[in-house]
Amino acid sequence: MQFHLNGFRPGNPLIAPASPLAPAHTEAVPSQVDVLIVGCGPAGLTLAAQLAAFPDIRTCIVEQKEGPMELGQADGIACRTMEMFEAFEFADSILKEACWINDVTFWKPDPAQPGRIARHGRVQDTEDGLSEFPHVILNQARVHDHYLERMRNSPSRLEPHYARRVLDVKIDHGAADYPVTVTLERCDAAHAGQIETVQARYVVGCDGARSNVRRAIGRQLVGDSANQAWGVMDVLAVTDFPDVRYKVAIQSEQGNVLIIPREGGHLVRFYVEMDKLDADERVASRNITVEQLIATAQRVLHPYKLDVKNVPWWSVYEIGQRICAKYDDVADAVATPDSPLPRVFIAGDACHTHSPKAGQGMNFSMQDSFNLGWKLAAVLRKQCAPELLHTYSSERQVVAQQLIDFDREWAKMFSDPAKEGGQGGVDPKEFQKYFEQHGRFTAGVGTHYAPSLLTGQASHQALASGFTVGMRFHSAPVVRVSDAKPLQLGHCGKADGRWRLYAFAGQNDLAQPESGLLALCRFLESDAASPLRRFTPSGQDIDSIFDLRAIFPQAYTEVALETLPALLLPPKGQLGMIDYEKVFSPDLKNAGQDIFELRGIDRQQGALVVVRPDQYVAQVLPLGDHAALSAYFESFMRA
C-alpha cells in the first residue's frame, strides 16, 4: 500500500484522514442524502464501505436491529469474495482468523455393513489455480466487523443508524435533486414510534427477504419451495467422526447432513435434513427443537458418536429459490432511451433467495453491491451518465437466475436419498461429480456478463485468452520492477472506483520507440481523444480515474525505469511524489508462474486489458487500437 503521499503522517496508515467534506455522525438521521442504504447485512455493508471512500458523496445506512450482528447466519466465504476483500484491504485479516476449506469428503451407507456410513470419495474443494485465495469459513458477524471498521476508518467516518424501520418509500421522478422520500420509524425503547423522513437521490434496499423497500417499489420474489425442512446449528461437540474438520456431505439411510468446520479449531456447523413439509406449510408450524436436530445428526453419523456440549446458535428453515424480475424501480422490462432513470434498487436477499447448501447467499449478495457501488459513485461524481445505472439490474438479475437454477438442482440432489442397487435416489458418484463440475460456480468465479454498454464483444480475446471479457480479472503473480517485489497483479485493484488499464507489452516493445506500449502511453498522455485527457478532472492526479499499469515480458532486471514514458512514473499528490509502482515483469524465477503463459497473453503483440472498478474484464484490445479504447469510454463517461 502507498501512504505519505502528501507529507509524512504518523499512525496507522489504514486510518484515512477525516475529510472536511464529511459531516459528523449524529443521533438523528440526516434529512437529505445522496444515497440511503437500508440494511446492515452483507449487501448493505459492502455498499456502505465502498461509498465511504468518497467523502463528497453523502451516504446514510440504517438498520432495523438495535446494534451490529454478533452471532450466526452465513459463514462461507468464496474465493471470489476473498478477492473482493483484498480490494477492501482486509483479506489478510480474514485469512488469519478463518477456517480454510481444502478438501470435501463424501459419505454414504456402507454396503458391507447396513446401518453404518462409510467414506466413499474425496475431492479438492477448489481446483488448482482457480484463485490466489482459498475458500474459507468465518462467522458473518466478523465479516460485518471488518466492513464497519473500514467505514469508521474511511475519509467519511461512516457509521450506521440502528433501530430504524422503513415505513414508506415514495418516488417523484419530476423532482430534480432528491426524488426519493423515505419515512422511517425508530424502534428502540428510548425512541419507539418516533418518525424520521429522509430525502435521497438514490435508495438501496438491502433489507433481506422480507424487504420493505422491495414491497414499496412493487417488486415480488417469485419462485417455489422444495417443501423440505432443514435445521442448522453451530456446535461445540466431542466426536470420533474422523472427518469433522473437513467439509463433509453425508447421505445416509437416516437422512442427510452437511458438516462445515468453523473458525477456531473446535466449532462445527451441521446442516441437518428434517421433515418433508406439506404444500403451503411453513417450517415454523413443526416446532422443531435443537434437541431434534442433535438427535437426527447423531442417527445420521452412526456408528460414530456425537456428544454436543454447547450450541451457540441454531435455526430451522425451508428450502426455496425465489427471484425478482428486476432489481430497480423502472417498470420497463428492458431499459430503453425513453425509460426513466432508476432511483431505488434492491440487493442481496431482497431480490433473490436460495438454499445455503452451496454457500452462495452472503457471497452473491456482496457481489450485487460491489457491482452497484462503483456505478452509483461514478454517476454521483458526474464521471458517468446516469443511464449506466440500468446495467445493475440487467447484469445481476441474469447471473442470479443462473445461481437459482444451480441451487435448485444441487439442493434436490442433496435431499434425495443415496441410490443403492436398483432403488431410486441419487447416485453418490454422480453427486460428487456434480460438485466437481460446478466448482467454479461455488467458488464465485463463474459469473460471466454478456456484451453490453460495459462489456465488449471479445473480438480480440485471443490476445489474452485467460482474461475472459465479462468475467472477473483472474490475478496472477508478477514482479514489481522498481523494487523486485513479488506480488499478485490483481491486488493493484482497490475498491476506490478507478478503472485499471493493464498494458501487456509485446516482446520487442522496449527496443522499438514506435511499439504498441510506448505508442499507447503517448496517446494516453497527449492525444485529445485520450480517455485520460478527456475524463480526468482538472487538477487531479493523472491516475485518479484510470490507473495504467505496464507488464513487460522480460525479466525485471532487463527493464530500465529511467527509459520508460513519464506516464508510467507519474508525479502525484501535493508534493509531486513519483509513483514507482506502475511497472511489472513476469515471475520467471519460479516455474509455471509466468503471467504471459498463465493467462494466454500474446507475447509478440501484447494486449490491453481494461478492467472495471468491480474487477471484471470490460475489454481486451490490441495495444494500438486507440480508437476502440476511446469509443468504449465515450459511450458512457462524461467529460
Curated annotation (Swiss-Prot):
Keyword set, alphabetical order = FAD, Flavoprotein, NADP, Oxidoreductase
GO terms for molecular function, please? Answer: 3-hydroxybenzoate 4-monooxygenase activity; FAD binding; protein homodimerization activity
Q: Does Ligase show up as a keyword for this record?
A: no
Listed EC numbers: 1.14.13.23
Return the Pfam families for the record.
FAD_binding_3, Phe_hydrox_dim
Catalyses: 3-hydroxybenzoate + NADPH + O2 + H(+) = 3,4-dihydroxybenzoate + NADP(+) + H2O
Effect on the protein upon substituting N227H: In MobA3-1; able to hydroxylate 3-aminophenol
CDD domains with a match to the protein in the record: PHOX_C
Q: Which residues bind FAD?
A: 34-64, 73, 166, 212, 269-271, 317, 349, 365
Q: Which cofactor does it need?
A: FAD
**Phenotype for K429R:** In MobA14-1; able to hydroxylate 3-aminophenol
List the InterPro entries. FAD-bd, FAD/NAD-bd_sf, Phe_hydrox_C_dim_dom, PHOX_C_sf, RIFMO-like, Thioredoxin-like_sf
The family note in this entry says:
Belongs to the PheA/TfdB FAD monooxygenase family.
**Any idea what job this protein has?**
Converts 3-hydroxybenzoate (m-hydroxybenzoate), and to a lesser extent p-hydroxybenzoate, to 3,4-dihydroxybenzoate (protocatechuate). Also acts on a number of analogs of 3-hydroxybenzoate substituted in the 2, 4, 5 and 6 positions.
UniProt subunit comment: Homodimer.
Q: Name it.
A: 3-hydroxybenzoate 4-monooxygenase
Q: Which organism is it from?
A: Comamonas testosteroni
Please name the gene that encodes this protein.
mobA
